[in-house]
Swiss-Prot record:
Keyword Kinase tagged: no
Keywords for this protein: Hypotensive agent, Metalloenzyme inhibitor, Metalloprotease inhibitor, Protease inhibitor, Pyrrolidone carboxylic acid, Secreted, Toxin
Modified residues (Pyrrolidone carboxylic acid): Q1
Any one GO MF annotation of this record: peptidase inhibitor activity
UniProt family annotation: Belongs to the bradykinin-potentiating peptide family.
Annotated source species: Bothrops cotiara
Protein name: Bradykinin-potentiating peptide 7b
Summary of the tissues where the protein is detected: Expressed by the venom gland.
Example of a GO biological process term: regulation of blood pressure
Any one Gene Ontology cellular component term annotated for this protein: extracellular region
Keyword Secreted carried by entry: yes
Localization per Swiss-Prot or TrEMBL: Secreted
Record's function text: This peptide both inhibits the activity of the angiotensin-converting enzyme (ACE) and enhances the action of bradykinin by inhibiting the peptidases that inactivate it. It acts as an indirect hypotensive agent.
Length: 7
């Protein structure tokens, strides 16, 4: 599962 890391 790929999710946009909150950077």
């Amino acid at each position: 599962q790929n999710w946009p890391s909150p950077k």
